[in-house]
From Swiss-Prot:
It is an enzyme of class 3 (hydrolase). HAMAP family: Salvage_MtnC (MF_01681). NCBIfam families: enolase-ppase (TIGR01691), HAD-SF-IA-v1 (TIGR01549). Pathway: Amino-acid biosynthesis; L-methionine biosynthesis via salvage pathway; L-methionine from S-methyl-5-thio-alpha-D-ribose 1-phosphate: step 3/6; Amino-acid biosynthesis; L-methionine biosynthesis via salvage pathway; L-methionine from S-methyl-5-thio-alpha-D-ribose 1-phosphate: step 4/6. Its cofactor is Mg(2+). CDD domains: HAD_EP. The gene is mtnC. This is Enolase-phosphatase E1. It catalyses: 5-methylsulfanyl-2,3-dioxopentyl phosphate + H2O = 1,2-dihydroxy-5-(methylsulfanyl)pent-1-en-3-one + phosphate. Signal peptide: none annotated. It comes from Citrobacter koseri (strain ATCC BAA-895 / CDC 4225-83 / SGSC4696). Its EC number is 3.1.3.77. GO terms for biological process: L-methionine salvage from methylthioadenosine. The keyword Hydrolase applies.
Length: 229
C-alpha cells in the first residue's frame, strides 16, 4: 500500500505559467536592488558566499554575482543560491498580497482525501523549501501547509538523479515501494522509479509521447489504494 505521496509543484499542483509569468518576472525585476541593499545582512550574505563557492570564484564582487544570477535565470539553472534569493523576494510579494500561489482546483480536495486516508504528503521541488511553503501558505485556497509532513528541494539532490529519491525515502522512513511520486516531467519519474518509487505523470495539457509512465490529467484521477506496492 502507498504510505506517502511526494508531489512536484510546477505543472503538477500548480500551473507552470504562474511560476514563469508571475513569480520569475517579479523576482527578476527586484533582484539587483534587493541583493545590493542586503548584501551585508543575513541570510543574503551567506547566500552570496555560497554562490561564490558554487561558481568557484571566492573573490567575485557583488556586481559579478548579480550578473551571474541573471545568467542563471536566463538558463533556468537550478542554482540553490538563486532559488534561495528568489524565495526571499517572493515572500514580500505574497505577504503584500501582490499575488497568491496558484493551485489547480482538483488539488486541494485530493490532498485532503489522501491525508484523511492516513497517507503522509510531501513536496519535492527545485524551488527552495521556503518558496514552497510560501506558495502553499498563501495559495488560492489559503494556507494549506498543514497538509504536508515535509518539504524537499535541491539540498536533498537534483530531481533527475536517482539518489535524490533514495535520500527522500530514507529521510521519511518509508520503503521506496510504498511512496508515490507525482510529476509532469518523465525524466524525474524515471529517476524516482529507478530508486524503487511508484510513479504517476500529471498531464495538464497535451500528452507526453516520450514517457512510459502511467499518465493522468488531474489529481482526482488518482486512487492510491489501487497502486500496488
Amino acid at each position: 500500500m502507498i504510505r506517502a505521496i511526494v508531489t512536484d509543484i510546477e505543472g503538477t499542483t500548480s500551473d507552470i505559467r504562474f511560476v514563469h509569468n508571475v513569480l520569475f518576472p517579479y523576482a527578476r525585476e527586484r533582484l539587483a536592488a534587493f541583493v545590493t541593499a542586503r548584501q551585508y545582512a543575513e541570510p543574503v550574505k551567506s547566500i552570496l558566499d555560497n554562490l561564490r563557492n558554487e561558481i568557484a570564484r571566492p573573490d567575485a564582487s557583488t556586481a559579478e554575482l548579480i550578473e551571474t544570477l541573471f545568467t542563471f535565470m536566463d538558463e533556468d539553472r537550478k542554482s540553490t543560491a538563486l532559488k534561495a534569493l528568489q524565495g526571499i523576494i517572493w515572500h514580500d510579494g505574497y505577504v503584500n498580497g501582490d499575488f497568491t500561489g496558484h493551485l489547480y482546483p482538483d488539488v486541494l480536495p485530493a490532498l485532503e482525501k489522501w491525508k484523511a486516508q492516513g497517507i503522509d504528503l510531501y513536496v519535492y521541488s527545485s524551488g527552495s523549501v521556503a518558496a514552497q511553503k510560501l506558495l502553499f501558505g498563501y495559495s488560492d485556497e489559503g494556507d494549506i501547509t498543514h497538509l504536508f509532513s515535509g518539504y524537499f528541494d535541491t539540498h536533498i539532490g537534483a530531481k533527475r538523479e536517482t539518489q535524490s529519491y533514495r535520500n527522500i525515502a530514507s529521510y521519511i522512513g518509508v520503503a521506496p515501494s510504498q511512496i508515490l511520486f507525482l510529476s509532469d516531467v518523465y525524466q524525474e519519474l524515471d529517476a524516482a522509479e529507478e530508486a524503487g518509487l511508484r510513479t504517476l505523470q500529471l498531464i495538464r495539457g497535451e500528452g507526453d509521447g516520450a514517457s512510459r509512465h502511467h499518465q493522468v490529467h488531474q489529481f482526482d484521477d488518482i486512487n492510491p489504494e489501487q497502486i500496488l506496492s
